[in-house]
């Protein structure tokens, strides 16, 4: 013998199915495609580990971050620094062999040049 379900359960199932049919009818195939694409990129980026930047990708990232200022491959040192320095790590050590973020990339940007003031000509 079959199991008899209660009237409230049957009404809930019926209303829920009708609700889903209406929602699926309203949602076009392009909406479903974009939703699937968003879910796919979200899940793949959430599972991806830290990435490294090497070669042309590193140069492109530095050009993007630093813009017209330019950049250095080694951290700039101040004037009059001692000749007995500790070995420096460069951007390749920090971003190619290990992963780095935008703040780390910005540390290798050249400083902003002061704006040229207009001279008075006599």
Curated annotation (Swiss-Prot):
GO terms for molecular function: growth factor activity; hormone activity; insulin-like growth factor receptor binding. It comes from the Eukaryota. It holds the Pfam family Insulin. GO terms for biological process: cell population proliferation; insulin-like growth factor receptor signaling pathway; negative regulation of apoptotic process; negative regulation of release of cytochrome c from mitochondria; negative regulation of smooth muscle cell apoptotic process; positive regulation of cell population proliferation; positive regulation of D-glucose import; positive regulation of glycogen biosynthetic process. PROSITE patterns: INSULIN. Keywords: Disulfide bond, Growth factor, Secreted, Signal. Residues 119-122 form a propeptide. Coiled coil: none annotated. Residues 90-110 are annotated as: A. Its main location: secreted. CDD domains: IlGF. Residues 78-89 are annotated as: C. Residues 111-118 are annotated as: D. Disulfide bonds join 54-96, 66-109, 95-100. It is found in: Secreted. The keyword Signal applies. Residues 49-77 are annotated as: B. Belongs to the insulin family. Forms a ternary complex with IGFR1 and ITGAV:ITGB3. Forms a ternary complex with IGFR1 and ITGA6:ITGB4. Forms a ternary complex with IGFBP3 and ALS. The insulin-like growth factors, isolated from plasma, are structurally and functionally related to insulin but have a much higher growth-promoting activity. May be a physiological regulator of [1-14C]-2-deoxy-D-glucose (2DG) transport and glycogen synthesis in osteoblasts. Stimulates glucose transport in bone-derived osteoblastic (PyMS) cells and is effective at much lower concentrations than insulin, not only regarding glycogen and DNA synthesis but also with regard to enhancing glucose uptake. May play a role in synapse maturation. PANTHER family: INSULIN-LIKE GROWTH FACTOR I (PTHR46845:SF1). This is Insulin-like growth factor 1. It comes from Equus caballus (Horse). The gene is IGF1.
